[in-house]
Amino acid sequence: MFQDNPLLAQLKQQLHAQTPRVEGLVKGTDKGFGFLEVDGQKSYFIPPPQMKKVMHGDRIIAAVHTNNDKESAEPEELVEPFLTRFVGRVQKKEGDNRLWIIPDHPLLKDAIPCRPIKSLTHPFADQDWAVAEMRRHPLKGDKHFQAELTDFITDKDDHFAPWWVTLMRHQLERNAPEVDSETLTLHDDLPREDLTALSFVTIDSASTEDMDDALYIRKEENGQLSLYIAIADPTAYIQPNSELDTIAAQRALTNYLPGFNIPMLPRELSDNLCSLRPNEKRPALVCQVGIMEDGALTDEIHFYSAWVESKAKLVYDNISDWLEGEETQWAPENEIVHEQVMLLKEMSEKRHVWREQHALVFKERPDYRFILDDSGNVLDIVAEKRRTANRIVEEAMITANICAAKVLSRNLGFGIYNVHTGFDPLYIDQVSQTLKEHGIETNADELLTLEGFCRLRRELDNQPNQFLDSRIRRFQNFAEIKTEPGPHFGLGLEAYATWTSPIRKYSDILNHRLLKAIISKSAAEKPQDEDCVRIAERRRANRMAERDVGDWLYARFLKPFAGTESTFNAEIIDITRGGIRVRLVENGAIAFIPAPFLHAVRDEIQCSQETGSVIIKGETAYKLNDIIPVRIEDVKLETRNIVARPI
């Protein structure tokens, strides 16, 4: 009776047209249901049957239905899938040739049917790691999700899976680039000054092979210091647009992961031909600058294409122990090295004081280093504080990069610059209001200037804690890479252009070529904005890879502590609606403390990212940068999540 009824069809069409629709992101839960978040303001419940049509992270359009004053979302159209290419673990049942894959993501737990592409002949076993690409989606008219396996990564028993899986996830190279060593010859027709008689020294870790900077310093009759910064010159071997140049441009950076690195350049170049090894003549680009009594740089800055010869390979810890009066077997091997170390220390102290007064100095935080055995097991995690020798090299490199920025700006007006513009103007009123609430009166317009930003930073550095600094840090812009000079608010400098790590950074290779063009008075080609985009994307991928491997290793290391009485001091680094994130001071691991662990009565606790505090019964119980004792409650190896509980 009702079949093909035009009135009924019209009614359905009207009801469909009248049903409100929203676009948003699907947020999954581990309980089968989900939510559709719209513009971060409103969320709609997605019942379990409807969640089978979508995946956490999908951007969709959904119909909103109201039943007994309760709203729910019915997914209708896929705008952008969350999963396209992904890594995961294969599932295969014994005696069954069918394959499934579970994506390696904390909120994606459903197995997706899959099959290998024709060219992939690896016989997959249960729990193998693989790369897959989504091929079917229910909102695209398919009956179910389906994926295609495109790469085998490694098997379930490989203890180095954290590295291989992470590199494949971020589509990063696994090995050093390989080129015919016979092609690694000098292509350098630029006249070089012979500076091999100067007593350059390198300062690195004991295990460092790719030594790309050497320092020489002397005191002039007028009391000023003359600092020479020699930087390895791979551009003497790498012609623009050559095969090797293309490789370096693609990789953009050496990738430093816990336990090992994947170099940007062939190791024959980075660890041998270009490495500033002691007593070996090497091509270098050298910057010479004077440092006055108050630590200011002189206006006279000279760049040379030169030959240098390091006279000694010095080690950070040895120099620091000796200069800091620690018990050590090491001492300068001769008077020349002794003089260099003492003058470099003087330079470092003067430059540090000058930067504190006229620019900005970063708050020092320790670096955390994983100690691994040959099988990739974490034996220990050590905190390495920045010591005297580290500060010597840091001040010399910052000085060199300031000089490069000045020379490039004066002579060309372009280069590769690190630019940081401070606070986002959209949030500057919130910054001013937050500061006012804590007794600091400011002018919003002044905070957007380099001088005003520096003045505020120095005032914040004098605060008894970093709470206020952490509150307003989220209103800052991210640092960028630009082809034209601009200020670096974070360093408190008018311009900053790095060139001191050309073995490890392609941006520094580009600046080397521009500096050489200035030296030779030849034409210089302005870098493309696309170069900056590619370098920034690769830097982000490398940092994410380092974080992901670190999370995996932290989870392995802390798993034995879960549920024990072992106590760790932890710094509160973020506060969200669901709880707080902390960093373990001893080893740098990030853990999450759910709000119910802070206070059991839900209506009596408020976790506020806006105020950077946790309010319990109307009183501030925790705030950003507090140090609190915690125990490890649970470690989920599958998701690399560490859950802690305050004591």
UniProtKB/Swiss-Prot annotation:
Main localization (coarse): cytoplasm
Boundaries of every S1 motif domain copy: 565-647
UniProt entry keywords in alphabetical sequence: Cytoplasm, Exonuclease, Hydrolase, Nuclease, RNA-binding
Gene Ontology BP terms: mRNA catabolic process
Localization in the cell: Cytoplasm
Annotated GO CC locations: cytosol
RNB domain boundaries: 192-520
Catalysed transformations (reactions): Exonucleolytic cleavage in the 3'- to 5'-direction to yield nucleoside 5'-phosphates
Domain of life: Bacteria
EC id: 3.1.13.1
Record InterPro entries: CSD, NA-bd_OB-fold, RNase_B_OB_dom, RNase_II, RNase_II/R, RNase_II/R_CS, RNase_II/RNase_R, RNR_Ribonuclease
Claim: Lipoprotein is one of the keywords in the record: no
Enzyme class of the recorded protein, top EC level: hydrolase
GO molecular function, one term: exoribonuclease II activity
Statement: the UniProt record of this protein carries the keyword Nuclease: yes
A Pfam entry, by short name: S1
Matches recorded under HAMAP family: RNase_II (MF_01036)
UniProt function note: Involved in mRNA degradation. Hydrolyzes single-stranded polyribonucleotides processively in the 3' to 5' direction.
PANTHER family listed in its UniProt record: EXORIBONUCLEASE 2, RIBONUCLEASE
Family: Belongs to the RNR ribonuclease family. RNase II subfamily.
Protein name as it appears in the record: Exoribonuclease 2
